[in-house]
Curated annotation (Swiss-Prot):
HAMAP family: TruB_bact. The active site is at D49 (nucleophile). This is tRNA pseudouridine synthase B. InterPro entries: PsdUridine_synth_cat_dom_sf, PsdUridine_synth_N, PUA-like_sf, PUA_sf, tRNA_psdUridine_synth_TruB, tRNA_sdUridine_synth_fam1_C, TruB_C. It comes from Baumannia cicadellinicola subsp. Homalodisca coagulata. The lineage of its organism: Bacteria, Pseudomonadati, Pseudomonadota, Gammaproteobacteria, Candidatus Palibaumannia. CDD domains: PseudoU_synth_EcTruB, PUA_TruB_bacterial. Responsible for synthesis of pseudouridine from uracil-55 in the psi GC loop of transfer RNAs. Belongs to the pseudouridine synthase TruB family. Type 1 subfamily.
Length: 317
């Protein structure tokens, strides 16, 4: 992986994998982390419901330029659902609007789960942050207003039954961006004929990131407090808490450019590269001494031709 954190700058640039706790909003945690690091730019890469916990990648500084690649990435979740009760929010925060007896068996569950593999269409819940005429749908829902929503195409890579009985079901789901786990549970409940709603939801992974690098808000606050005491090495200590910027695009192949090519790319010009590069997005890197530095994302628009797409500010490389 190319090196991308400049510890000599007066800014913090990188990605923190926050372990979101249940009951807090993603935006609240985003602003909390932004204040803790004292950065001007910060953004999360896909909100979690207040009920949910787990991985919430937060991009700081220059890393926000590449947040879309995490927003577009696939996600992994573990979810528990209560059977026999349907709520207006599709989760335990809502009002129970229907109760039905539960009469299910293993064969029935497995047959229904088979319908949730591959490409599926789902209608987003009314209690969501999707905008309609400039306002979030949940604001209409709270007033009892139902807005027609179009079905959206999502992809389920894997859905595994972890546990079930006549009161609950627990699943692990690997899905594409934009998938509403609450909707999957509500749909499963309807197909089972008993209704269901989410009681626990935890995000296990975003793209290639693993839980081992997650940190809770409390642990982060403690680590930052300690770092601030270690002047003049405060910035070094703070940056140790972060993943490098190019970790957001680690799935793209890296291409090393000459000094002349780097200069042209920074002017927005396309450059020639080896013909072995046929198409797709790449991480652009340059050598400085014995170290290779990441400085942006480019696209091979045709064999042997590289077009710059998103660059780090030069002072951060």
């Amino acid at each position: 992986m190319c090196f991308s954190l400049n510890i000599n700058s007066h800014n913090i640039n990188g990605i923190i994998l926050l372990d979101k706790q249940e009951g807090l909003s993603s935006n609240y945690l985003l602003h909390k982390v932004k204040r803790l690091f004292r950065v001007q730019k910060a953004g999360h890469t896909g909100a979690l419901d207040p009920l949910a916990s787990g991985m919430l990648p937060i991009c700081l500084g220059e890393a926000t330029k590449f947040s879309k690649y995490l927003l577009d990435a696939d996600k992994r979740y573990i979810v528990s659902a209560k059977l026999g009760e349907k709520t207006n929010t599709y989760d335990a925060t809502g009002i129970i609007i229907n109760t039905r007896p539960v009469t299910i068996n293993q064969a029935m569950i497995e047959h229904i789960m088979e319908q949730f593999y591959g490409d599926i269409y789902q209608i987003p819940p009314m209690f969501s942050s999707i905008k309609y005429q400039g306002r979030a749908l949940y604001k209409y829902a709270r007033k009892g207003i139902n807005i027609p929503r179009s079905a959206r195409l999502v992809h389920i890579y894997n859905l595994q039954i972890l546990d079930w009985d006549n009161t609950h079901i627990e699943l692990q789901i690997h899905c594409s961006k934009g998938t509403y786990i609450r909707t999957i549970i509500d749909d499963i409940g309807e197909l089972l004929g008993c209704g269901a709603h989410v009681t626990m939801l935890r995000r296990l992974a975003v793209a290639h990131y693993h839980t081992a690098r997650m940190i809770t808000l409390e642990s982060l606050q403690t680590a930052i407090t300690l770092a601030l005491r270690q002047t003049p090495n405060t910035l070094v200590q703070l940056n140790k808490l972060l993943l490098p910027i190019d970790s957001a695009v680690a799935n793209f192949p890296a291409i090393k450019l000459s000094k002349d090519s780097v200069a042209r790319v920074r002017k927005g010009q396309m450059v020639a590269v080896d013909q072995c590069w046929q198409s797709g997005l790449v991480r652009m890197c340059e050598n400085k001494g014995e170290t290779t530095y990441f400085f942006g994302i480019g696209e091979i628009t045709q064999p042997g031709v590289l077009k710059p797409k998103r660059l780090l500010a030069e002072k951060y490389v």
